Structures are given as structure tokens and as C-alpha cells.
Amino acid sequence: MAEIKNYTLNFGPQHPAAHGVLRLVLELDGEVIQRADPHIGLLHRGTEKLAEHKTFIQALPYMDRLDYVSMMCNEHAYVMAIEKMLGVEAPLRAQYIRVMFDEITRILNHLMSLGSHALDVGAMAVFLYAFREREDLMDCYEAVSGARMHAAYYRPGGVYRDLPDTMAQYGETSKYRSDKELRAMNDARSGSLLDFIEDFTNRFPACVDEYETLLTDNRIWKQRLVGIGVVDPDRAKALGFTGPMLRGSGVAWDLRKTQPYEVYDLMDFDVPVGVNGDCYDRYLVRVAELRESNRIIRQCVEWLRNNPGPVMIENHKIAPPKREAMKSNMEELIHHFKLFTEGFHVPPGEAYAAVEHPKGEFGIYLVSDGANKPYRLKIRAPGFAHLQSLDEMSRGHMIADAVTIIGTQDIVFGEIDR
């Protein structure tokens, strides 16, 4: 009798559902997965090593390019680690701005996750709906930093600039936008950035309802997600899960509540948790987080309206002087020149700072030898821990379910390969 061998199949890295450059070697018995072996490193750019040859400020833009869907949250952990070592604290207004943009980033990330997960499984419409709202939030990024993605907006000691009083307007009509649509878009952008964000928070709950109408009770969506990739709470903790992956298994661990940073202890929000630990519960957790992030943004907008103030510390050894002062005062010019050529020196020591990133706990472990460059920078990427469980989560499932599991893990290779 002939020996029966399992079939080996390469999934990715060119596969559209591979979320970038995942190469997955699947061992199959018929169509049932026996083993899944992820091969990583195809997007390795040596970020940790590059940072050792740049000043603390020059290394900041590298952070945006790690998880390139949650840009400002990456920056946040990095600047928090530097501030911890310098012993400085950002002004209260800057802390509120950071929290607000962290939550805007969380919505950006979850919309991308939701849309691409649905697209992978075969529901195309949700992706188009999600990108409609992402466009508005990209405009918020652009308003404060000039860039739609890689903002470099958070700085040690605060943020780059205060929130602008005006928003850019859209130009003439095109075949993609009618006069009526253009007027509606420009009306929302006729005031300040805070007005625009407030208008968005008023509209957004109805948008989330639309996504839920398309997916939550959809029979095909539930058949594809319910009971797939189940991880129990103890195993989730043992595997190092954080974020929606851990909360989907029923563990209410959220750094914003358990180890509050910035002004999260002043915010009123809930931590959604799942029950069954399957792909469907993780989807429900992310949808609930969209609503909670919207709540937090509203609270930040209300506070920021009523409390003007500085957004950067006044120590010009760390933070650059204002542009007008720099061009009229010799001492300020020297500060500016020294800061952007030599940078600032961080006292010898080490610090770990972690934020509740949209994908989980994103941590920066920073070691300084007293120089103007990091001696060592270690990045704790949440997706790295989640990807290692892919083999365990997909065993016994069909090939098509591997796509569902990759989608639910919300993997981005910028942070995994670093």
C-alpha cells in the first residue's frame, strides 16, 4: 500500500490576504491544516540598530514606520521612554492632545483591520465603507503634522505644535465628487480642527452601526468566524497575547486602565471583553473599541476647547524654541542649532515605556550610556507574540480558515520584522 504523505503549500508572501510579506508554509492533510510555519524577516529594516546611530530626535520618525497603520501610538511609547529617563513631563494640554490622537489612531487601525479582514473573507463593501471614515481621520493627521501617515508629531516634552484653527478645504468638483458632496465636506472643514473632530464624533456612531449591519448578524460572516481560532484565557496569557487578542479571550487587561499613562485615569470609558475567545469575539471587541475610542475623543475635545495652554515644555535643551524667537534672539538660535545637530544627552540608565497600542502592548525598552544617541533600543511589538500562535490557532481548520485567523490577528509586518 502506498504511503500517504501530507501536502506542503506556500501561502504568501504574494498572497493578497498575507497582510504584507507573510510567508506561511502549510502542511495539509487534504484541505485540513496539520501545521502552519510562519517565515518572517522579509520586511526587516534593522530599526533597532539604525536608532543607535541617530540622535534621540532623529530616531523618532523610524517609529512611525514600524506599525504603519498605528503611527502616533508607536511614537507615544518612544517619547514616553525618553521623558521617563529625562525626568520631564509633557504639559497637560499636550497630554490631552496625545490621548486624543492615540484614540484617533486606534479608530484608524481598527477600521483598516475590520475592512481588510472582511475583504479577506469575501465581504468587499465593508472595506470601502471603512476607508470613507479613515479619509477624515487622515485629514486630522495632515492638519497637525502636514503628513497623512508618518506624522512625527509627538516629541520629547510635548507635541510638535498646537491644534490649528483652520482646516484645508477640498478644491473643485471631479467625476468622483458632486457639488453637493463637496459642499458638505467643506462645511465640516470650515472651522477649527477641534470643530472638525467634534463633527466626526457626532457622525461616527452611525457609521459603526452601518458596519455592524453589514457584518455582525450576517450569516456568512458568522459561519466564517464563530468557533474559528479559539484561544482560552490561560493559553492567551501564556502565549503573551495583549490588546484585542487577549480581551477577546475574556481577560480584561488594558494598560489604559491597569497602568494608566498620560490622562487616561481622567477618562470615562469601558474595556470590552469577549467570552468565547474565537475570531467572532475578537471582531466584536474591536467594534466595541471603536465606540469607546469615540467616547474618549469627545471628552478630550471638550477639555481642549476650555483649557488653552502650552503644548511643549520650556526647557530649550530638550524642546526647540519658537520659530519667531529663534529668528530674533541669538541665544535661541544657538539652542535650535545645537538641538538639531547634536541633540540632547540623556542620563545613563534604562527605561521601559508601554502604551495600549491598537494591536496590544507596544513597548520601548531604552538604554542610555549618557550620550546623545540610544545605546540600545528594544521594541516590544504586539504582533510578534500573536503571530507565534498562528500554528496553534489554525491546526485542524481548513485552508480558508487560515485567512480568517491571519485577519483576526491584525498583523502588520513593519512592527514584527522591525
Swiss-Prot record:
Substrates-to-products reaction catalysed: a quinone + NADH + 5 H(+)(in) = a quinol + NAD(+) + 4 H(+)(out)
GO cellular component, one term: plasma membrane
Localization (cell): Cell inner membrane
Keyword field: Cell inner membrane, Cell membrane, Membrane, NAD, Quinone, Translocase, Transport, Ubiquinone
Organism of origin: Bordetella avium (strain 197N)
A single GO molecular function term of this UniProt record: quinone binding
The protein's enzyme class: translocase
Assembly, per entry: NDH-1 is composed of 14 different subunits. Subunits NuoB, C, D, E, F, and G constitute the peripheral sector of the complex.
Lineage, broadest ranks: Bacteria, Pseudomonadati, Pseudomonadota, Betaproteobacteria, Burkholderiales
Identification of the protein by name: NADH-quinone oxidoreductase subunit D
NCBIfam families linked: NuoD, PRK06075.1
Family: Belongs to the complex I 49 kDa subunit family.
InterPro entries documented for this protein: NADH_Q_OxRdtase_suD (IPR001135), NADH_UbQ_OxRdtase_49kDa_CS (IPR014029), NDH1_su_D/H (IPR022885), NiFe-Hase_large (IPR029014)
UniProt xrefs under HAMAP family: NDH1_NuoD
Record function comment: NDH-1 shuttles electrons from NADH, via FMN and iron-sulfur (Fe-S) centers, to quinones in the respiratory chain. The immediate electron acceptor for the enzyme in this species is believed to be ubiquinone. Couples the redox reaction to proton translocation (for every two electrons transferred, four hydrogen ions are translocated across the cytoplasmic membrane), and thus conserves the redox energy in a proton gradient.
Protein topology in the membrane: Peripheral membrane protein
Enzyme Commission number, as recorded: 7.1.1.-
